């Protein structure tokens, strides 16, 4: 019988090279199988605003969210994530998920169980100063979060039965204005907030109603987003619809009649130092039913007109709060949250109800001209930017096939996210920042 010959011994280097080759093949195979974010219509390459990455949120696929906020000093982005009943915190420096602070109502469905009941879901509005984060919830409460402790440290009722929604702080963080937009009549609550204090002492100071001349009870009118304007040292608050605007003989429908609402909205000017008559002015808008509001340069405030409030709204309004002169940004409407980023001198709009489909709108802060509109998932109504790092954060819902009614009815979100669970899209923008 012939003897078998053993294979010749191989050198150690050849063995290592073979192992490295196999590892490289496996790594390449794994990478090719991993979903790729920032693809499709939501990631154009010719725009100044470019899709940088997408951040996945652990837990439930994203079906419903509300307002978002950035604290550039802490390098943190906050999202009112109803799908996971908490506020998501993102590291804006490294574009990574940090944690979700729970303890909120989460998603409440309508009576038929077929869609999200926004008026009773939470969290809703969010804002922050220093280590303090404030968030409205679906049960008419303000949640006070200590970010150093990573938990809710106080819950303050505003006395309603529906959500506490949008809110804004003074620059020193000592006064907070928050609105119950779904009460009838709607109202705002002024709080003493924590400023830079170590311990919580949040307390309600006053409940603020608008004259029934403008918001008669019983017709479903609302109050929306406050913003602080440093030019006049007042809160400026968007109101989707007021009665008799325009005040022509034919009249308009603010909800007292059947059919579409035809009255336009307004902005309120609120003086937080006057607790007796805090509503200083009601400024009617021209063919604009706004949701969002953000403080821009030169005493200007952008308000996000939307056809969800007034049929036919095809523009976004920039209003000067000293003269009350205004300009309209054409070919951009349907926004909920709007945000001014001083690092890039751009306004950004979460235009989920834009005619033709949801977009991230980009507007020059000096000229007030539309720069570009970038497609988004069909419910992308929230936007916030980090002025130090010049990044824009836009939440994307998961597809309707995954989460049901309220989900993305396009493929745009899945292309941005690189998956089917929703995400937070991160866009890089040109500008001057500290980092």
Predicted regions and their residues:
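Hydrophobic helical h-region of N-terminal Sec-dependent signal peptides
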Residues: 12, 16-26
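Predominantly soluble domains enriched in secretory-pathway, periplasmic, or organellar proteins
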Residues: 33-435
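N-terminal leader/targeting segments
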Residues: 2, 18-19, 157
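N-terminal signal peptide c-region/cleavage motif recognized by signal peptidases
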Residues: 28-30
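N-terminal secretory signal peptides that target proteins for export/translocation
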Residues: 1-14
